[in-house]
Regions:
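Long, low-complexity regulatory segments enriched in Ser/Thr/Pro/Gly and acidic residues
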Residues: 1-143
Length: 143
């Protein structure tokens, strides 16, 4: 464990997602007052029903920089072929191939402790490029 803790703002924003107020949250490791912390990067507004889920996922993915790591949490919702409604609060670890080695190590070392501090996570996506995001989301939606 790296010892990097989430800011109060980051934790409070995640609580809004878990109470179905927002669709996704993106976090980044940042320096605040000389200390590395997991901070809020951006949020995505809630979409109603299954409609808009794909567009919202695309918007979420567009917030993940090509050369910097991020964590994300996305409230996935879908209807299965048999008509059953499903949902999964999905943790996303984004460490792109273009990120610096030190940054990849920090995100890797902090991932499990940060994810463990977030109640209600049902699935995890570990992605290094855009195709990983697409493939892993499809895998979650099949479960």
């Amino acid at each position: 464990m790296s010892g990097i803790q989430a800011t109060d703002e980051a934790r409070e924003t995640y609580q809004k997602l878990s109470r179905s107020k927002i669709q996704y949250v993106v976090f980044k490791i940042d320096k605040v007052d000389g200390t590395e912390v997991i901070a809020l990067d951006c949020i995505g507004e809630k979409v109603k029903g299954d409609e808009g889920q794909d567009a919202c996922w695309e918007d979420f993915c567009s917030k993940l920089p090509e050369n910097e790591g991020r964590y994300g949490v996305f409230d996935l919702r879908w209807t299965q072929d048999d008509g059953r409604k499903r949902d999964s609060v999905c943790f996303v670890s984004w460490t792109p191939d273009g990120a610096k080695i030190r940054q990849k190590m920090m995100y890797g070392a902090t991932q499990e402790s940060f994810k463990g501090s977030l109640d209600g996570i049902k699935s995890t996506i570990v992605a290094h490029d855009a195709s990983d995001l697409t493939d892993e989301r499809a895998s979650v939606l099949k479960k």
